[in-house]
C-alpha cells in the first residue's frame, strides 16, 4: 500500500501538457515549454485550480526538423476553455494525473519578445465553468446530503466522498450558483450519527471528485502524519516533520 513520505523539494518532470483547440482538431503538447506548474486544492476551495508559466520560442517540430511558426496563443489558438491533459512525475516517482483534464480559465501577463514569448495560463475544472452557467432554482425537501448530491449532479459533478446528514432542511434555490448553495448548506448540515451541537461540514473538490465531509468525522480519523510548527526548525522525535524545516515536502504516493 503506498504511503506518505517526506522528501527534499526538487523539480518534477512534466511528461504531458497537451492543449486541445476549441475550434479545430488540433492539439499541441507544450510540456517542453512549461517552466513552472503549480496545482492547488484545499478543503476551503470549491474547485481545483492550477497555474502554468509557458515559454514559447515560436518554433515547432516538423518531422525531423524545426520550423518557424506563429506563437501557440495564436496558432492553436488559446482563448479560454481549452481542455488540457496534464501528467507530472516527481523525483520519487509519484505521478499526478488529471483523468478529466483541466480547462484554461484565462491567459494573463503575456510578455512578447523578439525570440520568445512568456505567458501564464490559469486552469480550473470543467465543473467550475458549469457552475458559472447553472443556477439552483427549485424547491428542495429532505436531507441536506441528498440536496448537495442532486445539485452537483446538475453540473455533471462526481463525488469522491459524501457524508450523510441527519434532519430535514427545506429551502428554495433563489437563483444561486451550485457551489454557493452547497457551501451555504454545509454550514447548516449535521452528521447522521449525532443531532447535538456539531461543527458543520466542508464542501470542496479534489482531482478525484467532490467532497461533502463532516468536520467532526474528519477529526475522528487516525492521523496520517504529525507536524509541528515552531521557530527553531527542529523536529522532535515524536513528530514526523517541522513545517518550517527547510525543504520539507509532503508527498502522497499512489
Residue locations for each model-derived region?
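Structured segments of extracytoplasmic/periplasmic soluble domains
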Residues: 150, 154, 188-191
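Active-site palm subdomain of RNA-directed nucleic acid polymerases
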Residues: 159
Amino acid at each position: 500500500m503506498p504511503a506518505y513520505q517526506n522528501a527534499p523539494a526538487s523539480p518534477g518532470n512534466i511528461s504531458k501538457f497537451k492543449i486541445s483547440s476549441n475550434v479545430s482538431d488540433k492539439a499541441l503538447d507544450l510540456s517542453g515549454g512549461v517552466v513552472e506548474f503549480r496545482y492547488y486544492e484545499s478543503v476551503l476551495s470549491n474547485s481545483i485550480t492550477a497555474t502554468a508559466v509557458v515559454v514559447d520560442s515560436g518554433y515547432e517540430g516538423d518531422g525531423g526538423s524545426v520550423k518557424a511558426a506563429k506563437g501557440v496563443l495564436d496558432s492553436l489558438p488559446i482563448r479560454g476553455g481549452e481542455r488540457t491533459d496534464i501528467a507530472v512525475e516527481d523525483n520519487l516517482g509519484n505521478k499526478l494525473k488529471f483523468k478529466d483534464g483541466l480547462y484554461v480559465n484565462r491567459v494573463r501577463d503575456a510578455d512578447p519578445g523578439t525570440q520568445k514569448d512568456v505567458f501564464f495560463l490559469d486552469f480550473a475544472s470543467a465543473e467550475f465553468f458549469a457552475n458559472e452557467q447553472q443556477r439552483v432554482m427549485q424547491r428542495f425537501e429532505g436531507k441536506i446530503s441528498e440536496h448537495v448530491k442532486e445539485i452537483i449532479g446538475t453540473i455533471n459533478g462526481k463525488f469522491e466522498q459524501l457524508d450523510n446528514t441527519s434532519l430535514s432542511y427545506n429551502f428554495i434555490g433563489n437563483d444561486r450558483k451550485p457551489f454557493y448553495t452547497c457551501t451555504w448548506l454545509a454550514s447548516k448540515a449535521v452528521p447522521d450519527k449525532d443531532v447535538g451541537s456539531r461543527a458543520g461540514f466542508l464542501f470542496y473538490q479534489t482531482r478525484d471528485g467532490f467532497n461533502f465531509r463532516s468536520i467532526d468525522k474528519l477529526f475522528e480519523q487516525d492521523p496520517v502524519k504529525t507536524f509541528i510548527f515552531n521557530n527553531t526548525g527542529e523536529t522532535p522525535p515524536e513528530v514526523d516533520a517541522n513545517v518550517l524545516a527547510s525543504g520539507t515536502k509532503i508527498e502522497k504516493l499512489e
